[in-house]
Every structure is written in structure tokens, then in C-alpha cells.
Amino acid sequence: MESIIDTEDTIAAIASAVSLGKGGIAVIRVSGEEAINSCKNIVETKSKYAWESHRVFHGFIKDNLENKFIDEILITVMHSPNSFTGEDIVELHCHGGVIVVNKVIETLLSNNTGVRIANPGEFSQRAFLNGKIDLTQAESINQLINAKNLKSAEIAFNGVKGEIKKKIDIIKNDLIEQLSEIEARVDFEEDFSEFNYNDFSRNIKIIKEKIKILIENSKRGAHIHNGISIALIGKTNVGKSSLLNLLSKKEKAIVTSIPGTTRDIIEVNLTIKDIPIKIIDTAGIRETDEYIENIGIDKSFEMIQNSDYIIYLYSLEEGLNKDDEKIISKIPQEKLITILGNKKDLIDSKKVNKKNLSNSVLMSIKNDEGEKELVEKIVKKCGSKEFENIDIFLNERQISNLTDCLKNLNDTDPIIANKLPFDLLSIEVRDGIKNLSRITGQELTEDLLNNIFSKFCIGK
């Protein structure tokens, strides 16, 4: 693709996570025409492999302006075009931690006039513009970096390998074949028999089914990326925060005996039996005059509507009362995983009234008792089978383009039904192809491109 954005500058950024005050190794990536020369200005080395492509060699960072050494490093060099960006790349592997890393970056910039800090996603943007990756691969890299569970990472990596582009190209080639026949008939109509609207309709229907399956799988795949949301709903001080901590195996929420402690929504992503789950701890529901707490309670009722599933908690010590039943009545039954009675350790479970509680679980969250039964109910309700055949999923932008393509193909229906001039079909098919090309990045505006890559991290 011809570059529509200036890529003449040499850019630099931290390409690894840096811990505040400590860290093992940090990587500073430099890419561009002056990448090698700019690094030569601040690196002293005696290695015989220095500055050869695809070599790692030892050296020291030196600030020539202050005439002092900064750090001992390893240097990796990749010459154009055999690099991620397609440009010359140098990666400086220095000791981690904010102080050292910032000083290396400062030294690189102050000792060279032609180097600047990279914009978010600019390395990936250059890789795309230089034809090293297509747009779906670039976006999949970002999904991989931001994956919240292993399944999401696996699917994102399929996109990095080019699997999204493969599926889009199959659909695109099918449409190009249909368009080619229409245009050939327009140019050489006398050489063809009468146009068969039924055959065309049949072929378009097959293509539309492929698109619908891809859209549906992508929507299901969003659950993998974000996690199936399960909201913990109940009155105050019934153990919602304790359950969140139990399932996540971490102290994510404050646990006290003071009612109304949780006022903000707390989310934890985890995997249960290979199912990506997002557990949401909500504010306890009760009558209160406190303004801030009421905001949290309002959010709890919102989560009843917005979450995929719900676990309702109540205290066995108090029993399931009319207030609980009133809240439960607001929960769509298809969303309800279970009604969980907590604090089993404080009562005689034989005396619990289980009327209308066939779907209940009795637990002592404090003593880790009943977790296995709860997990079984979560797995049964959420299931993992719906994810078995998902190998890729498209993001919102890609789904939007695919949906627009589907609309183009649906717009051929009245043309076919009324047997209007068949050359009108070419308009819709061509627009459909353009929408598919937008997915892989062949039909772009500069603003759209900048918007996509601005959502990436700076070092990528």
C-alpha cells in the first residue's frame, strides 16, 4: 500500500513493560533510516558482530554530552527490509526500572537530532504501511497484547498469523468472481447466453451465509476476549466480595462486617474450566440515605440488565426474605446461575427451608465450603462448547465493515426479484468488495488509520 503518512522520521520507544523503581530487562526499540547511526552515537562496543543484521552483541550506553557511561546493554540489529517495520531497527536491551530506562531514552534523543518518541502504535503502523502486515494482523497484535485469558490470546495469535485475512479474502474472491462475470457480460453481451438471475442469487446466498457465520462467531468470540460477565448480586454484607476473592484466589475486594463497604463495581477476569469469565462484584442492595452508596446500588441494578449471568447471594443466617425475593424477581431467570446461601457455618443446614430453591447452593465462603458445587453450576450455565469452533474473531470495526458488505449483498435482492438490468448488480457487489478491502486495510483514509493505531501501546 502506498504510504499516506510521513514515515521519514526515526522513532524510538520503550517496547517492554517497566516496573517503577525495579525491573530485570527493558527493551528500547528504534526504527527508521537513522536507527543504526543514531544508536552508534551512544553505544560503545568491541564486538566483531557489531551492527550486523540479526546479530546480538554487547556494549555500553554512553552520554557523549556528559561524557559518562549510563548502562551495560545488549544490542539487536535488523536491517531493512527484514524487520518488523520493514525499516532498519535497533533494539537496546538495558537494565529495567524507570530511572535507567528514562536516562537511556533521554541520551538517545539528546545525542541525536533526527530521533523522536514514537506515537502509540507507530511501529505497527509502519509495518502495515511498508507491507509487512495487513491491517487485521496489526489489530490482532493489539488484541494479543491486551488478551485477558489464554483462549483469547490463542485466537488473537491466529489473527496475527493472517487467519482473518484468509477468511476475508475467500469471501472477497467469491465476490470478485461474480463481479467479473457481470462486467464481462456488460462488455461482451452478445457472446453470452441470457443472464441467469437464479444462479446469481444462489451464489450470493452462499456468500451471505459465510458472512453471517463470521459475524455470529465474532460476536460469540467477544465473550472470549472480554469474558462472560457474571454479576454477584445481593443485599449488603452477604459475602459478595468474599466470593469474588475466593474465585479469583486474590484479595481484590475489601471484606469487612460493615454493610455498604463495596460502593464501586469491581471486576476480575479469570478462567474457570477453560471458560473465560469476568466476575463483577456489585454494591450491596439496601435502603440508605447515603448519596454515594445509592449510586453504587443503582449500578448494581444496571448490572442485572447488562451482565450475561447472575449469582444471587443471601445470608443463611438471616434466611431468604421478602426483600431478597423482590430483588430476585427483577432477575431474568435465564440469567440466573444460582441462588447462593452463604454463611453455612453459622447455621444448621438441615433446618434451611429449600422451598423454591432447587437451583440453590449452600456455602461457607469463609471456610471454602461449597466452591466445587458452585463452579459446576457456573460451567453448566456458561459452558465451553459455544467456543469450540471459534478460531478467530473480528473487532467492532471489522464487524461493521462486514455488516456493510452484507447490506450491499442484501440490496441485490430487489434487483434480482424484479429482474432489473443486471449491470445494476455490479454496483452493490463492487461496494461490497470495497467494504471487505477496508477490513484488511486496502481502502483507507489517513484519519481512520491514525484512529486505529492510536489505540495501540506506544512501544508497538
Swiss-Prot record:
Binding annotation for GTP: 237-242, 256-262, 281-284
Pfam families per UniProt: MMR_HSR1, MnmE_helical, TrmE_N
Top-level lineage group: Bacteria
Task: Indicate where this protein resides in the cell.
Answer: Cytoplasm
Cofactors named for this entry: K(+)
* UniProt record similarity statement: Belongs to the TRAFAC class TrmE-Era-EngA-EngB-Septin-like GTPase superfamily. TrmE GTPase family.
Q: What is this protein called?
A: tRNA modification GTPase MnmE
Origin organism of this chain? Prochlorococcus marinus subsp. pastoris (strain CCMP1986 / NIES-2087 / MED4)
Species lineage, top-down? Bacteria, Bacillati, Cyanobacteriota, Cyanophyceae, Synechococcales
